[in-house]
């Protein structure tokens, strides 16, 4: 599933980005979004 993190949650490494939901660890009720374009870019956003 695609995800966007430019305005949905605290940025971990870089923003804005569009990518896919990753199974990485974020706080409860949040999900990790990993960028399409670079492995090191990801962020946490609130689950919808």
Curated annotation (Swiss-Prot):
Q: What keywords sit in the KW lines?
A: Disulfide bond, Ion channel impairing toxin, Nematocyst, Neurotoxin, Secreted, Toxin, Voltage-gated sodium channel impairing toxin
- A molecular function GO annotation: toxin activity
- The source's superkingdom equals Eukaryota
Record InterPro entries: Anenome_toxin, Myo_ane_neurotoxin_sf
Bilayer-spanning residue ranges: none
Q: Please state where this protein is localized.
A: Secreted; Nematocyst
Which GO CC annotations does the UniProt entry carry?
extracellular region; nematocyst
SS bonds (residue pairs): 3-43, 5-33, 26-44
**Which GO terms fall under biological process for this protein?**
regulation of signal transduction
The similarity annotation says: Belongs to the sea anemone sodium channel inhibitory toxin family. Type II subfamily.
Write out the function statement from the record.
Binds specifically to voltage-gated sodium channels (Nav), thereby delaying their inactivation during signal transduction. Is highly toxic to crabs (by intrahemocoelic injection), but without effect upon mice (by intraperitoneal injection).
Designated name of the protein: Delta-stichotoxin-She1a
What does the organism's lineage look like at the top? Eukaryota, Metazoa, Cnidaria, Anthozoa, Hexacorallia
